[in-house]
From Swiss-Prot:
GO terms for biological process: translation. Residues 1-34 are annotated as: Disordered. This is Large ribosomal subunit protein bL32. One of its GO terms (cellular component) is large ribosomal subunit. It comes from Sodalis glossinidius (strain morsitans).
Length: 56
């Protein structure tokens, strides 16, 4: 089992955790339906960039 030789400093701990922050998702509003969706994804109604791409 691996055991550390020395206690990691607060600085090293902070540097390791610097990439752990969560970011908010970027959402867009569809031109045709006004529905919000993730960028580069279709809406739940099947619209993408103002056009109907999936017929339901």
């Amino acid at each position: 089992m691996a055991v550390q030789q020395n206690k990691p400093t607060r600085s090293k701990r902070g540097m390791r955790r610097s990439h752990d922050a969560l970011t908010t998702s970027t959402v867009s509003v569809d031109k045709a339906s006004g529905e919000t969706h993730l960028r580069h994804h279709i809406t739940a109604d099947g619209f993408y960039r103002g056009r109907k791409v999936i017929a339901k």
